[in-house]
Every structure is written in C-alpha cells, then in structure tokens.
C-alpha cells in the first residue's frame, strides 16, 4: 500500500520552522498577530529591555534574563512566562553561524486571559509566587499550540480564521498549567498582583513624569507600605528603581538611535539634571552616555536595536 505523501511527511519541528521563517538577524514581527521571531548568530552582551506580558520559547540555543538580583536561564525545554511589564537585562548565551539562536515570543492579551479566567474559574491552580517572571518546563500541549501557531506562517490564508483560536487555546493551556495562578492573579481585579500590574502599566506610560508613590498607592487602593511590599514582590525593584530603569533604558534608546544628544535625552525622559542622569546612566550601563554611544557604534551593535522583548524599548507609544 502506498502512503500518500501528505501522510508520510513528518510535521516540521519548531527549529525547522524558525530556520525557515526567522530569516533576518534580530527580532521580526510576523503576519500572525502577537507572534515575533528572533535569530542571532553570536552570543551577545547584556541588553537592557522591557518585557511585556508574553511567553517566550527558545528552539535552539540558550538565553539568560536577569530580574533584580535573580538570573534565569532557559533553553529548548523551557518556557519563560512574563505576567507583567518588567525592565530586565537579557543576553544570548549560545549562538553561532552554524547553529543560530532561534527563539520566539507570543504576546499575552490580558483581556483574553481575564475572559478565560471567568469562563473556566475552577481549573486554575493557586496563585503561588507573585513574581512577574518565571522559567518553567515547557509542557507538550503548550508546545503543540505554539508549533501550530508558527505553522500558520506556511499557510497565511488561514491566519485570520485560525490564529485567534490557537491564541485562545494557548491562553487556556497556560491558565490551567502549573503557573496558571500567576496569570489569574494578573487579571483578578480584587487581587494585589492585578493592582500592582495596573500601577506598572501606568509607570510605563508615565515614566517621564514625577513619581508620587503615595498617590499611586491610593489610586490602586493600597497602603504605601503594602504597595512597596507587593511592588517589589512582583518586580524585584522598588517603584523608584523601576522608574529609573524605564527612564534610563528609554534614554539609551534615544541615544543609540541618534534621536537625541545626551542633554536632550536626559530632559526627555524626565531628568532635571544632566549630571545626575550621567551618573545614574553609568551606574546601570557601566559607561557614561558618550562612552556607551561610542562603544555601541564602534562595535557594530546598532542593528541589534529591534523591538519589545529583545531590544531597548520605545516607550513613546
């Protein structure tokens, strides 16, 4: 009996799909809403970036992310779950021209997660840790959903009909998985994590404005001490340090993309004193703004400025 070719062919692996579709170095968006692919051919220096709520998978290679004092490495058998927007440091650990680093991330829609949490209230596990970042084992069902999402790139005519269904399936599987409580806490209006997530999104939008912690705590119906405690539990940073990270990372993006000089960048992100800006810039990035700019362009690193998850973030939106 002859086996039809369509049945005989093995479905492509995630590595094969990303090899085919992640054709450019750095980050690239795709025709599938919320799906982004990444390719690198060399290990990288640490990159300061803002991760938004998402799941991240590595098909080939390894990556390291740092949140506060914690370092998390992940590879092909792992899943990185980001439940709130966080300023992080990330670097590629393993990559070469013969064996490139291949990865992807899928944006998580809080509205979808919230709807699923209401629709399936009995299936979510306990909340567990408040931390907004975790590396966990990649479950086969989650891997299968992500694989089918990426395979839609082979049949773009099916994306409008099938992508929303697969994204819903992925959200459900994450919600009922080992870290589902973390996602549920993100969207439960009465929960502390949701209140902190609301404050974080406000900080991301208003990073260049004066920080008034007392008012922010009142706005999310928390005491100042409780707000500080839960904010650090979620982000590993105090509200002030969180805002400084956002400001300095946006200033760095402005400098490296040549959209502003040092003084202009410092004022645009909310600093009143360029000298204070330069001191804090050196403390975070290990070099003064001018030294960093020279080093960046001399090292041919300008092309690594991509988009959310893998780049210096653009906080203008």
Name these PLM-found stretches:
Residues 253, 257-260, 268, 272-317:
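…primarily DNA-binding HTH/wHTH and HhH modules…
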Residues 169, 173-179, 186-188, 204, ...:
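Basic/polar phosphate-binding segments, predominantly the helix-turn-helix DNA-binding elements
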Residues 1-31, 35-36, 44-45, 126-131, ...:
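A short, N-terminal "cap"/entry segment at the start of jelly-roll beta-barrel domains
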Residues 27-124:
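N-terminal regulatory/effector-sensing and dimerization cores
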Residues 64, 71, 210, 259-260:
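Residue at a beta-strand N-cap/secondary-structure junction
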Residues 2-13, 113-169, 173-174, 179, ...:
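Amphipathic alpha-helical segments enriched in hydrophobic/aromatic residues interleaved with Lys/Arg
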Residues 138-141, 166, 188-199, 235, ...:
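N-terminal positioning helix adjacent to the helix-turn-helix/winged-helix DNA-binding module
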Residues 198-209, 236, 250-257:
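Short, amphipathic alpha-helix enriched in basic
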């Amino acid at each position: 009996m002859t086996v039809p070719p369509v049945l005989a062919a093995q479905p492509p692996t995630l590595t094969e799909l990303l090899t085919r579709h992640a054709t450019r170095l750095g980050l690239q968006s795709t025709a599938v809403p919320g799906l982004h692919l990444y390719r690198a051919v060399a290990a990288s220096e640490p990159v300061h970036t803002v991760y938004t709520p998402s799941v991240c998978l590595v098909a080939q290679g390894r990556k390291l992310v740092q949140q506060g004092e914690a370092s998390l490495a992940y590879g092909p058998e792992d899943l990185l779950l980001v439940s709130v927007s966080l300023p992080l440091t990330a670097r590629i650990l393993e990559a070469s021209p013969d064996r490139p680093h291949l990865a992807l991330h899928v944006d998580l829609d809080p509205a979808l997660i919230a709807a699923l949490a209401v629709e399936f209230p009995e299936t979510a596990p306990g909340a567990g840790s408040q931390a907004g970042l975790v590396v966990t084992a990649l479950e086969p069902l989650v891997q299968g959903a992500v694989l089918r999402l990426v395979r839609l790139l082979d049949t773009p005519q099916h994306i409008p009909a099938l992508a929303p269904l697969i994204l819903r399936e992925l959200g459900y599987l994450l919600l009922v998985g080992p870290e589902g409580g973390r996602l549920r806490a993100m969207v439960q209006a009465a929960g502390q994590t949701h209140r902190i997530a609301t404050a974080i999104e406000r900080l991301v939008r208003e990073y260049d404005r004066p920080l008034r912690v007392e008012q922010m705590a009142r706005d999310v119906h928390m005491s100042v001490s409780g707000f500080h405690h839960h904010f650090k539990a979620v982000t590993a940073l105090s509200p002030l340090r969180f805002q400084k990270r956002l400001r300095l990372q946006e200033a760095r993006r402005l400098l490296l993309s040549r959209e502003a000089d040092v003084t202009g960048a410092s004022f645009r992100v909310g600093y009143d004193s360029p000298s204070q800006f330069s001191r804090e810039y050196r403390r975070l990035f290990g070099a003064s703004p001018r030294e960093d700019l020279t080093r960046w362009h001399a090292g041919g690193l300008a092309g690594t400025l991509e988009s959310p998850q893998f780049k210096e973030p653009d906080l203008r939106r």
